[in-house]
Amino acid sequence: MKRVLVIHGPNVNLTGKREKEVYGEITFEEINNMIKREAAKLDIAVKIQQSNSEGEIINLIHSAENNFDAIIINPAAYTHYSLAIMDAIASVSVPVIEVHISNIFGREEFRKVSVTASRCKGVITGFGPYSYILALYAVKFLEDSIGG
């Protein structure tokens, strides 16, 4: 069974309560339940964490080494400027998939830049909460394609 660390960045815990026109009405708890249900179907064990703190997110990324087979991360606002999170992603050997609920490329100019994406295996953006589900399938695909 593959082990995946899911990291939600700042303010993701308010999904369903804030900017519903951007992030939708589904709640943070509902997103996590969706992730757990789909992961079980794919025979993937998930640990879900959320932090509003850059340092805490970095520590979570570091903790994945030798403990998880992949990371799914929504860096949220840190996507656009956190070189520290980018460096943390680069420092681990496990594949990292960046996800976003909204399409960051269809939003404000500053949101169209992802400094973290360059260190990720791939990016899934704009599919609402299903971005996380698609990322689980990407993890499964990576597993199958490398014979793991």
Swiss-Prot record:
GO terms for biological process: amino acid biosynthetic process; aromatic amino acid family biosynthetic process; chorismate biosynthetic process; quinate catabolic process. Keywords: Amino-acid biosynthesis, Aromatic amino acid biosynthesis, Lyase. The active site is at Y23, H100. It catalyses: 3-dehydroquinate = 3-dehydroshikimate + H2O. It comes from the Bacteria. Its EC number is 4.2.1.10. It is an enzyme of class 4 (lyase). Pathway: Metabolic intermediate biosynthesis; chorismate biosynthesis; chorismate from D-erythrose 4-phosphate and phosphoenolpyruvate: step 3/7. Transmembrane segments: none annotated. One of its GO terms (molecular function) is 3-dehydroquinate dehydratase activity. It holds the Pfam family DHquinase_II. Substrate binds at N74, H80, D87, I101, S102, R111. The record marks R18 as: Transition state stabilizer. Catalyzes a trans-dehydration via an enolate intermediate. Homododecamer. Belongs to the type-II 3-dehydroquinase family. This is 3-dehydroquinate dehydratase. It comes from Caldanaerobacter subterraneus subsp. tengcongensis (strain DSM 15242 / JCM 11007 / NBRC 100824 / MB4). The gene is aroQ.
